């Protein structure tokens, strides 16, 4: 079973009136619920922290929110953001996940992976190789690419027109590029942070 946690509201960093902000947050959450249902996931959790402003929230609070959800659902595998995404919220969520999953004797989290986020992961321009997203795990998604595109269409407010990185064409192109790295049509790439066997 898969459970997603949305820590930030995803909207409050965009200037708008309170009524419109509330409506947009509710729409975003409705879309996420629809995606979860279509994908066979458990109902997602929404924490509604301020968007693109997690650096204004005490770090301990973020880590404790994540730790509470981990203790509640007891996942063996966690997927989180890449530590060097351009988005400050992604950076802090990564650090909070690492903090919340520190390897204590009774931990049940055996695998932690970082995923790439179009329009955030690739926008962190740096010459330092150790700061780039260099995947070491690839999953063949050739059989699921059309389903992924259908599900992504539910997130109407997040998708953009080509050539934006969050356009359907760009997302499919990224999957094709990752697939070409392992000799398949389409793939998704990850960084292994922890894998206990």
Model feature map: region roles:
Residues 1-21:
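ATP-dependent adenylation/pyrophosphate-handling site
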Residues 32-36:
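Conserved SAM-binding loop
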Residues 23-31:
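N-terminal Rossmann-like or analogous alpha/beta NTP/dinucleotide-binding catalytic cores
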Residues 23, 37, 42-43, 52-197:
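Metal-dependent de-N-acetylase/amidase catalytic core
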